[in-house]
Amino acid sequence: LGTSSYTFHGGEHSRFSHCLGVYEIARQITEIFEEKYPDEWDSSESLLTMTAALLHDLGHGAYSHTFENLFDTNHEAITQDIIQSPDTEIHQVLLQVAPDFPKKVASVIDHTYPNKQVVQLISSQIDADRMDYLLRDSYFTGAFYGQFDLTRILRVIRPVKNGIAFQRNGMHAIEDYVLSRYQMYMQVYFHP
């Protein structure tokens, strides 16, 4: 929320709780993909997806979005450095999964991982990150603009060859999500 919490006083929560929320949405989606779309989803990608969801904002500092342009920093690059640096505990834990696991997680965050399904679940126009922060920010600010039907979106999301897609019968839920995102930016994030 950055400085929006000064206008919306209830709008205070942590990156930690947000990352847990992104992880949970990613977990639900990968579970759905494993159950409903085993031919289109490689279940070995589920752990990577959930790990990237949990760690995606690791490089954020206080007011990070506000100060990134000022100090010419990039939280995603910092996140990748933390994940790939042999000196960090996170790197050491990820190595226990597989020797190349830290590099894979970092490549998801860098959007260079070859499986675009995984990348798009973490970072795209409709992803676990945005779904969580819209609902979370709407709840904590008391602004209802960010509300959308997550349950319906989870019912209609599906893996396709080059990413993720949504079934036509869920288009109203997708339209509602897009409008909710627009309204949150206009009414909360860019509040006059």
Language-model region placement:
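Sequence-structural signature of the catalytic-core scaffold of metal-dependent phosphohydrolases
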Residues: 1-51, 59-192
